[in-house]
Amino acid sequence: MNDLIKRKLDILPDQPGCYLMKDRQGTIIYVGKAKVLKNRVRSYFTGTHEGKTQRLVSEIEDFEYIVTSSNIEALILELNLIKLHDPKYNVMLTDDKTYPYLKITNEKHPRLITTRKVKKDKAKYFGPYPNAYAASETKKLLDRLYPLRKCVQLPSKVCLYYHMGQCIAPCVKEIEGHVYQEMIEDMTKFLNGGVEAVKKELEVKMLAAAENLEFERAKEFRDQIAHIDTVMQKQKIVSSDTTNRDVFGYAVEKGWMCVQVFFVRQGKLIERDVSIFPIYQDPEEEFLTFVGRFYEKPEHIKPKEVFIPQAIDGAILTELLGIKVLTPKRGQKKELVDLATKNAEIAVAAKFQLIERQEERTIGACEALGDAMGITTPLRIEAFDNSHMHGTDAVSAMVVFIDGKPAKKEYRKYKTRTAAKHDDYGAMQEVIRRRYIRVLKEGLPLPDLVLIDGGKGQMEVAREVLEDELGLVIPIAGLAKDDKHNTSQLLFGDPPEVIALKRTSDGFYLLQRIQDEVHRFAITFLRQQHEKHAIQSVLDQIEGVGPKRKQQLLKHFGSVKKIREASELALQEAGMPANLASHIYAYFQQESLSKE
């Protein structure tokens, strides 16, 4: 804890609000909320913490806070700040499932479709469904009951669905708006739990048709009732009423939280969502934040009501979400919450062991490297490699590992601009200079360690750029390879010396992985550039094929190989004039003969 933090801790107010933790670059790494800011923020810098929280605290160099007038204001502000800053320690680890939904489109002639994407498009969404089959079967049922249009574009004449009684044919008839409105209201009622009411209506229609001796019509109503029973009976009943609700339960172990959400629709448990993530404040506060963020996702449609454990203040969530949030105290509803909680306890116990082992390997490997080199644990490592094809198409690549794991969104590729042909040192200087000028210009996070795929010379030119030109003091290490192109040594220091690391250690394994990854990334980019230039050079040699026609051919055929194999007719179908198609075809035929 530095002096700045000590001074700020002394003047913290005892009011609700949000706090923003910052690292040495001033980047916001965590946002939290508190009923009493003074107590919450001070707790981070006193006593001992779980490993995850200790890592967060070790990175805090400064903090800010915003006072609010109430806890609900603090929760809303926290959600907005997380959305704005996307701090790395506020990441929620979820199972990333996408669920199928039924959608009534917002069109002049609405359609009923299945989708896995929920958008803000004024359409009506219903779900989620446990799988595509369940959504499809429900859609088939509704198609028989409510004949909305099926075609994406209206055809010029009626289709088979009209003859099957499953479309009212807006393609040839003028359909009044109230007809659609009535159908949509009935479908909404059905999908929101009014199954029995729909069945009763069908039974009345069936009996009326039978009395009028319309036996085929009566049979159709009977089949529809049977189809409803078949579809609905495949789902397990967990509640005696048909209110749509989400049931939350959570469990905490060793600084990790598991939240399970049961989706109950029409009295049936149809699916669950499981999330496991590290926590850095009171479990109750973390749970409130989780629920708020859960319903920010468009695919999580708010139900009529939500059940949560008794330890949580439901009033805050009711105000935040605008729906009923209840804490059942007895009976079937409490049993549902208990079931979700029990499942969360089992999941966090089982998954925690796997997560802990992985953390030990990845974070442990970073710690081992830091200890061996005598530097702060390198949680952010940036590694560089150069590559070229016999001196041409020279490229460089950078990969980023955070907490011992690849952060692929932060990988970068570079075409060499200024370095001379075969000048590996010049290429390394160029890529280091370009990377860290941009880092300084844009205020991006600096690495804890720069890894160079190379030896002492490569390390020295990187140091000259970082320290002498840019004034940055960042540890630089080199990765040397043996005759078989495998990682053999870690070089570090000034002058560089070999750092002893067991080849079987997690630290050495991490270095191998980083070196293999940056080499793979560089080679892949090199091949892409080489193939691109090869394609350009072949087509550029054909008279009459300019940039536009070259692009036209590649877009149509996808590759030079397929252009080579194309017939004159196929070339004409790709938009080439007959005489040019003949010329291109003849060119590649001649090329083929010359190779034989």
Swiss-Prot record:
Q: Which GO terms describe its biological process?
A: nucleotide-excision repair; SOS response
- Provide GO CC annotations from the record: cytoplasm; excinuclease repair complex
Instruction: Describe the location of the GIY-YIG domain by residue ranges.
Output: 14-91
Among its keywords, does the record have ATP-binding? no
Q: Where in the cell is it found?
A: Cytoplasm
* Gene3D superfamilies found in the cross-reference section: 5' to 3' exonuclease, C-terminal subdomain, GIY-YIG endonuclease, UVR domain, UvrC, RNAse H endonuclease domain
Task: Write out the entry's keywords from A to Z.
Answer: Cytoplasm, DNA damage, DNA excision, DNA repair, Excision nuclease, SOS response
Q: Which PROSITE patterns match?
A: GIY_YIG, UVR, UVRC
InterPro entries for the chain? GIY-YIG_endonuc, GIY-YIG_endonuc_sf, GIY-YIG_UvrC_Cho, RuvA_2-like, UVR_dom, UVR_dom_sf, UvrABC_protein_C, UvrC
- Occurrences of domain UVR (ranges): 196-231
**In Gene Ontology terms, what is one molecular function of this protein?**
DNA binding
Q: What is its main location?
A: cytoplasm
How the protein assembles, per its UniProt entry? Interacts with UvrB in an incision complex.
Briefly state the protein's biological role.
The UvrABC repair system catalyzes the recognition and processing of DNA lesions. UvrC both incises the 5' and 3' sides of the lesion. The N-terminal half is responsible for the 3' incision and the C-terminal half is responsible for the 5' incision.
Q: Which PANTHER family match?
A: UVRABC SYSTEM PROTEIN C, UVRC/OXIDOREDUCTASE
Can you tell me which family this protein belongs to? Belongs to the UvrC family.
According to UniProt, the name of this protein is UvrABC system protein C
Q: Which organism is it from?
A: Lysinibacillus sphaericus (strain C3-41)
